[in-house]
A protein has these predicted regions:
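Noncatalytic alpha-helical scaffold of FAD-dependent oxidoreductases
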Residues: 2-485
Length: 485
């Protein structure tokens, strides 16, 4: 295959941008766009005040990446936040963007890649929203350099639980809310717009897949990369990996490049995670690299049959997306189709185990050993990360300067006779706590209330709740994430 150079930058970086005011080349938010935004804020505040006072507040969104399934709320109990989806402004010189809180990272990446820029951390799935990643969980292979998405937020405008719209930044009146907003999962308020930092990119990413038969050796390499930010003399812009099972581990190192001897493409018939075993190196466009996991929802498209070549050839390409699979899972959960099928076949019941957990690097080998012994689910995603700042975030129990590895595992495991649903999830939670780690709250949690608040800084949370939602208009974090209300 012929090589590719940076002269094709516009085509390689992706489609045209999606945004609110239509003229991305402007150097400031247009007055018309600002008027539309302010009108949308006023309308949302009125809508919020009109919601029934005794009903939980929920957002009317077309997609979700949460795995805490709840009954659908009545239409008159939801907030229409569609007006807050769009990129309001990109400033290439300052390397910043002003973005609606409901903007998906797919739209945001398309808007910024046009200028050779990207957000500092782009979570793995296209329909994750910027507001969702900042108030919840967001991590990716650039997290070894850039930490978590909320660390590159400059300021944000938030609709708080008491109905105010406030501007929160690192300094100023609402600095405490700014730092306490991450990991609050919409229980303190909703981000309506955010100003974020961007970083320059090159058109391609050169990836190298390095195999390890020993997890200790794999973690030794993680430590070396975290210390040096290089490997074999090359800079490490991205770092993640896969555990396929005991004795088979891979680290994938990504480095920006302005040339590509060849290009691989994993949005159609080819499957990215399978390529990790097949190739020692590869080249992708930067856009395709950002979404390499989305096409097959990492590897979770398997139950839908789309990894079968015969089915995949017939499956419309536009439906090879994580949000499509997530809707299929939600449909199955709503109507209990898989449960009915298992009962008719007299198959053993299965427990859904969908978690992302962060473990300190020095304890990762212990967690991996536990996981293969007790959970026995493969593959497992490995994503080394380190906070970008030297100051902790109050509701995010991660220490500055410390290297962690995010373990992502998503699937079902069989329940043995006498084991209740939640058995394996509770095992994971206990082991994570023992090893000094924490888990993301986007999926069902089983903690007791006292333990939960000990892990997630209940004192700081309750003080923020009293300051910004004294009437408890929004759900409590424990009620939302554990009780599933």
């Amino acid at each position: 295959m012929t090589g590719v150079t940076g002269s094709r930058i516009a085509g390689v970086f992706g489609r045209g941008p999606v945004r609110a005011d239509g003229d991305l080349a402007s150097h400031e938010v247009s007055s018309a766009a600002l008027r539309r935004y302010r009108a949308a804020v006023d309308k949302l505040r009125s809508q919020y005040q009109a919601l029934p006072a005794d009903a939980p507040v929920r957002l009317a969104k077309p997609t979700s990446n949460l795995f805490r399934f709840r009954d659908t709320a009545p239409a008159d109990h939801t907030l229409d936040v569609s007006a807050f989806r769009g990129v309001l402004h990109v400033d290439p010189a300052a390397r910043t963007a002003v973005v609606g809180g409901m903007t998906t990272y797919e739209d945001l990446a398309d808007a910024t890649l046009r200028y050779g820029l990207m957000p500092l951390v782009v979570p793995q799935l296209k329909t994750i929203t910027l507001g969702g990643a900042v108030t919840g969980l967001g991590i990716e292979s650039s997290s070894i350099r850039n930490g978590l998405p909320h660390e590159s937020v400059i300021e944000m405008e938030i609709l708080t639980g008491d109905g105010r719209v406030v501007t929160a930044a690192r300094e100023g009146e609402h600095a405490r809310l700014f730092r306490g907003f991450p990991n609050s999962y919409g229980t303190l308020g909703y981000a309506l717009s955010l100003t974020i930092e961007l970083e320059p990119v090159q058109p391609y990413v050169h990836v190298r897949h390095r195999p390890f038969s020993s997890f200790h050796e794999c973690m030794s390499a993680v430590g070396q990369i975290a210390a040096d930010s290089t490997i074999d003399g090359a800079p490490v812009d991205f770092l993640d990996g896969i555990a396929f099972g005991p004795g088979e581990f891979y680290l994938t190192i990504g480095t920006f490049s302005d040339v590509a001897p060849w290009l691989s493409e994993y949005t159609g018939q080819q499957i990215y995670y399978k390529s990790v075993r097949r190739f020692r190196e590869d080249f992708l466009t930067t856009r395709d690299y950002l979404w390499r996991w989305d096409t097959d929802w990492f590897w979770c498209s398997r139950p839908f049959g789309v990894q079968n070549p015969a089915i995949r050839r017939l499956w419309p390409r536009r439906f090879l997306r994580s949000d499509v699979y997530r809707r299929l899972v939600a449909f199955d959960r709503r109507y209990g189709l898989t449960d009915q099928m298992n009962r008719s076949r007299r198959a053993s019941p299965r427990e859904m185990v969908i978690q992302d957990v962060e473990i300190p690097a020095e304890n990762c080998a212990d967690f991996m050993e536990f996981f293969f012994r007790e959970i026995r689910m493969t593959p497992v995603w490995l994503c080394p990360m380190r906070l970008r700042e030297d100051r902790a975030w109050p509701l995010y129990p991660l220490e500055p300067g410390r290297v962690y590895v995010n373990f992502g595992f998503w699937g079902t495991v069989p329940l043995s006779p006498g084991q209740a649903d939640g058995h394996h999830n509770r095992l994971v939670e206990r082991e994570v706590a023992t090893l000094g780690g924490s888990k993301g709250l986007y999926s069902t949690a089983y903690y007791g209330e006292e333990e939960f608040w000990r892990i997630y800084n209940g004192q700081e949370y309750q003080e923020l709740k009293r300051a910004y939602d004294p009437g408890r208009r929004l759900l409590d974090l424990y009620d939302k994430c554990v009780r599933g209300r």
